[in-house]
């Protein structure tokens, strides 16, 4: 009620959203702008963290095997790639899907390398009913 007596706020000219050639209007930052802001944030975080040197009782796990280092690097690379791919998605994944994504690195290699298409005979299905419906119409 009291806002009737106040001076109306000065209206700023709203920025015109970019329109693509196909007629869609882009809202928010583009992927390039998001990457630039993400890089800026990570460099700010890295710059603000104090350096830790020569701590004897550290609780961090050290990886000495080069193969394990390679797998750890690939896992980190895959998770950053997945995060980058999902950054443009306008919704979030369900919590149980996110939990599965987090535990996939804990699975043994023989389970991860299993190819489900090797044993397709167990997925056999008879389409005679569907074919008869299509042929009758």
Curated annotation (Swiss-Prot):
Biased composition (Basic and acidic residues): 32-44
Source organism, top-level taxon: Eukaryota
Biased composition, class Polar residues, residue ranges: 50-63
Chain spans, region Disordered: 1-72
Domain UMA: 86-134
UniProt-recorded name of the protein: UBAP1-MVB12-associated (UMA)-domain containing protein 1
Organism (species): Homo sapiens
Lineage per the UniProt record: Eukaryota, Metazoa, Chordata, Craniata, Vertebrata
